[in-house]
C-alpha cells in the first residue's frame, strides 16, 4: 500500500471524527452550554452547511497545485476544531463548526483526484477506497474514543484531539504525497459545463437518496425497543456496524476496478434497499437485525468510492467541483433522511417504519444507478 494514500486517509479520518462525533457528544455540549438538545443539534447543521459552502469554493483554487490545496484544507480543519475546543459560548461554537465543515467536501474532492493520479494502472477505484477508509475507521474507533473522552473528561478535548491530529496530517501529506500534475484550467464557466450532462445528476441523485435512505433508519432505538438489546450493548453493536463500513468500502474499491464502478454501486444500493425492507418485517429477530444493520453500513460505504470515481470521470473540465459535490449530496441526504425518518415517529408509528421509508429512498437510488450503468457503462 502506498504511503501517499495512507496520508490521504489520515485526512479523511480527521474529517470523519469531526463530522460524526457530534452525535455522541451532543448531550455533554448541551449540558455544559446550558442549551437544549434540539438547540445543540443545530451544530450538526452548521457543519453540513460548511460542507455545502466549502465545496464550490474549490473553483477559486483551481489553478493551484493539488498538494498545496490539500495542505490549506487541512489547515482550515485544524483552525475550526481548535476554535471549537476553545469556544466560550454557543454562537462561537456554531461558527467554529461551520469553519470545520468548509474543507470537508473539498478535501474529498481533491483527495480523490490525487489518489486516482497516484494509483497503479487499473486500480483507481481501489486507491480512492483507501483514502475513504479513513472515514470508516473514524466511525469504528475515532467516534467511540471521542465520545468516551467527552463523557469522562470534556467534550472540548475531543475537538482538541482532532485539531492536534491535523498537525500529523499536515506532516504526512507534506512528506508522503508527491506533487501531481495540475488539472487543465477550463476557466470559471468551464468548471460548471459538466452539469449540462445527465450523468453527474444521476450519480448525485443516487448519492443523496441512497444515503438518505440509511439515515431515515433510527438504528439505536430500533435495536433497543424492537430487537430487545440493552442500552449498554449498543457500543458493541455500533463497533460491528463500523466493521461493516470498513469491509464494504475496501471490497467495493477492488470490485470497481475489476467490474464497472456504476454496476458495483448499483448492486450495493440494491443491497441496502433489500436490507432495510427486511428490517421493517424482521427487526424483532435480534440476531438478524444486527446482520441487516451490518449489511446496511457495508452498503453505505460500498457505494462511496465508486460514486466518487464516477463523478471524477463524468465531470470533465470541472473534476474538483464534481468530486467535491459528492459530499454535498451526502450531507443533503443526511438531512433529508433524518427528517423523513422522523415523520412516522411523530404520528405514533413504530420504530420499524423509518426503515420502510429508507428502503423506498434506497430503491430510487438503485434505479438511478442502474439507469446510469445501462446508459453510460454497459454500452462502452
Predicted regions and their residues:
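Helix-breaking motifs and short loop linkers at transmembrane-helix boundaries and internal kinks
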Residues: 34, 86-92, 103, 228, ...
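Conserved MFS/SLC helix-loop-helix module at the cytosolic interface between two early adjacent transmembrane helices
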Residues: 53-91
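Helix-to-loop junctions at the C-terminal end of transmembrane segments
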Residues: 54-66, 248-260, 345-346
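Juxtamembrane intracellular "pre-TM" segments in multi-pass secondary transporters
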Residues: 176-207
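C-terminal transmembrane helical hairpin of 12-TM major facilitator-type secondary transporters
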Residues: 262-307
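Helix-loop-helix hairpin linking two adjacent transmembrane segments in secondary transporters
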Residues: 90-92, 121-175
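Cytoplasmic helix-loop-helix junction between adjacent transmembrane helices
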Residues: 96-134
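Paired small-residue
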Residues: 80-83, 91-100, 287-295
Amino acid at each position: 500500500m502506498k504511503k501517499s494514500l495512507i496520508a490521504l486517509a489520515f485526512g479523511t479520518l480527521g474529517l470523519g471524527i469531526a463530522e460524526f462525533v457530534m452525535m455522541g457528544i451532543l448531550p455533554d455540549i448541551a449540558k455544559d452550554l446550558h442549551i437544549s438538545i434540539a438547540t445543540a443539534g443545530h451544530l450538526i447543521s452548521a457543519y453540513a452547511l460548511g460542507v455545502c459552502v466549502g465545496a464550490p469554493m474549490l473553483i477559486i483554487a483551481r489553478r493551484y497545485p493539488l498538494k498545496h490545496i490539500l495542505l490549506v484544507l487541512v489547515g482550515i480543519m485544524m483552525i475550526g476544531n481548535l476554535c471549537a475546543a476553545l469556544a466560550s459560548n454557543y454562537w462561537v461554537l456554531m461558527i467554529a463548526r461551520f469553519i470545520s465543515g468548509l474543507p470537508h467536501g473539498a478535501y474529498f474532492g481533491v483527495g480523490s483526484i490525487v489518489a486516482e493520479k497516484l494509483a497503479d494502472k487499473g486500480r483507481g477505484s481501489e486507491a480512492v477506497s483507501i483514502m475513504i477508509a479513513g472515514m470508516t475507521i473514524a466511525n469504528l474507533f475515532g467516534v467511540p474514543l471521542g465520545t468516551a473522552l467527552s463523557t469522562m473528561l470534556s467534550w472540548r478535548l475531543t475537538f482538541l484531539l482532532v485539531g492536534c491530529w491535523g498537525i500529523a496530517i499536515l506532516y504526512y501529506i507534506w512528506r508522503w504525497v508527491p506533487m501531481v500534475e495540475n488539472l487543465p484550467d477550463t476557466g470559471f464557466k468551464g468548471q460548471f459545463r459538466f452539469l449540462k450532462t445527465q450523468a453527474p445528476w444521476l450519480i448525485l441523485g443516487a448519492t443523496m437518496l441512497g444515503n438518505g435512505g440509511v439515515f431515515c433508519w433510527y438504528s439505536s432505538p430500533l435495536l433497543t425497543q424492537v430487537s430487545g438489546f440493552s442500552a449498554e450493548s449498543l457500543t458493541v453493536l455500533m463497533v460491528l456496524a463500523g466493521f461493516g463500513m470498513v469491509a464494504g468500502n475496501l471490497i467495493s474499491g477492488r470490485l470497481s476496478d475489476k467490474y464497472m464502478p456504476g454496476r458495483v454501486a448499483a448492486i450495493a444500493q440494491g443491497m441496502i434497499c433489500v436490507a432495510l425492507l427486511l428490517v421493517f418485517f424482521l427487526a424483532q429477530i435480534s440476531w438478524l437485525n444486527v446482520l441487516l444493520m451490518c449489511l446496511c453500513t457495508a452498503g453505505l460505504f460500498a457505494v462511496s468510492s465508486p460514486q466518487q470515481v464516477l463523478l471524477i470521470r463524468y465531470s470533465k473540465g470541472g473534476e474538483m467541483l464534481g468530486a467535491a459535490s459528492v459530499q454535498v449530496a451526502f450531507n443533503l441526504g443526511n438531512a433529508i433522511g433524518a427528517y423523513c425518518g422522523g415523520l412516522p415517529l411523530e404520528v405514533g408509528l413504530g420504530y420499524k417504519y423509518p426503515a420502510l421509508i429508507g428502503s423506498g429512498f434506497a430503491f430510487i437510488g438503485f434505479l438511478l444507478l442502474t439507469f446510469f450503468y445501462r446508459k453510460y457503462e454497459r454500452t462502452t
